[in-house]
Amino acid sequence: EEIKVEKLDINISSAQGLLYAHGALWVNINGKNAGVHRLTDTNGDDQFDKDEYLKPMQGGGEHGPHALVLSPDKEHIYVIGGNHTKLPKTDTSVVPTNWDEDLLLKRLPDARGHAANIRAPGGWIARFDKDGKNWETVAIGFRNQYDMAFNIDGELFSYDADMEWDAGTPWYRPTRLYHVTSGADFGWRTGTGKWPQWYPDMLPPAYDIGPGSPVGVTSGLGAKFPAKYQKAIYCLDWTYGTMSAMFLSPAGASYTAVREEFVASSQMRMTDAVINPYDGAMYYTVGGRGGQSELHRVTYIGDESTKPVKAKSANAADRKIRRSLEALHKPESPNAVNKAWKYLGHNDRHIRWAARIAIELQPTSQWQDKALSEKDTQASLTALCALARQGEA
């Protein structure tokens, strides 16, 4: 079967994010003219002839601007920046914007100076509308997540990097799969400043994978694979040439995961993967750092059904509660304090998180007295955490 490769007649390079949506090719450039561009064909000749530089970014290299992904409802485009990419000015933020290092003990920076001067928010995820406007900060506290994907429930997942030189230290954090919810902070801080996952104001991973170099992430939805593999999230590791199929199980308002090695070869430096909606095959690329670039295809051969999956996951009620609270993640949200307060003592960490963020985004004058007088132990701890983060002594 002949593969046709057509070089686009466009004056851009170093694109680490590519997305065709809404009649345009959206490009996130990592290098000269870094940031988000929109390429369109204005005269119908099947060539992109217009380049709109929508959002400049400061940052580059392997920790620079990364992936672009379309939301399930196709109304938003999500964009990633690694921890060497300064978060550009956004119009709104569902993350409270007074982030800081929040360290009690003196930090030891990396002995070789890596990211020694990088401070919060670290790596980030933002989104903008289909016109390239109305930018909003979604989550922070990553190290260097290249890519992301939505699962069958419309929930977002990303695969974050470790700092390999930290291996064996108490502050080492392995590469990990994150369930990225509204207003999340995953606690990356440079050097020894990384937050442990028991901190109440950071969210834990869905799964710790181990040493590696995270690159592409994709959902199996649309693949002509058995149902289990259609529902999986695939995480690609450049260093070890491994693609992991992550099988998600609902756990309250979030998920846990089980990992299966799906494709592996130490000779293949995998970079990204995608499901082709026309033939139902998975395609993945290999290359990087001057190595040979390749395109590979994965298809299923067997007797299991490959009908498209439609069933949603269990625990929909918990996710519904969390999402109703996330709808309050905006300043001056009417009645947000009263609506969210009863969930501050919930036994699910992600529901408590969503409730606390909704409250933190409101003026403290609306809820400081409630926080100081709350009697329920768990609700009191969550409310006082919010007050410690947002109140003024």
What are these regions (language model features)?
Residues 1-327, 358:
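Beta-propeller domains with acidic blade repeats across secreted/periplasmic ectodomains
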